[in-house]
Structures are given as C-alpha cells and as structure tokens.
Amino acid sequence: MNKFFTNILILVISFLCFYSKVDAAEILQVTSSSVLLIGDHNRTYTVKLACTEISPELEEKSVGWLKRQLPRHTKVNLKPQGSLDGMLIAKIIPFNSKIDITEKYINEGLATNNC
C-alpha cells in the first residue's frame, strides 16, 4: 500500500513538472531607441535591436513609439545575432506578433536597415 502512494506521489510531481507554465523573456525597460532591458525571471540582458540605425533627430519619437509597441512586461522571443561590448544584439519578436520589431520600426520610417 505504501508503494502505491509513493508511485501516485511521483506521478503527480512528474505531471506538475512537465506541464508547468513556461516563462518567457519580457521587456523590463526601453532604455533608448535601440536598446532594451529584457529579463527572464532570473537574469537580465541589455539588448540592442539588430539591423537598426536611428537618426538623432528621430530619437525621442522613436523611443515613444518603441514604448507603445513594447510596454513593460511584454513577452518576447529573442533571436540573437551577436554581441558588442557585452551587449546582446538580437531580433525581438513579440509573442502576439510574428513580425520582428525591427521590421515594424523600418516600415514606420523611424529607422533604417543597416544589415
């Protein structure tokens, strides 16, 4: 009987481990028009948007647009492209979209593609 309860307990724990909610990376802060602070509940990353170049005169408008597109706690997928001076360079795709935020940025006329 004791072995039966042990097996049931192992089964319940296994079920909870395998079917628990997966936490994704999320936006913590828009630092500038091309730099974001992203966290995944135990680490934070400074991430630069890949393939973007923003002119200085559009900086303020670009930051506002980026904050509207990626508000705090927005879940995102990262596609790393490399790193520079300890900063991750990545494409960022919001969960509610299949389009990279860089493509949207360029389509809005706020950035140019430098890849």
Where in the sequence are the language-model features?
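Small beta-barrel nucleic-acid-binding modules, primarily SNase/OB-fold domains
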Residues: 5-7, 15-115
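N-terminal secretory signal peptides that target proteins for export/translocation
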Residues: 1-2
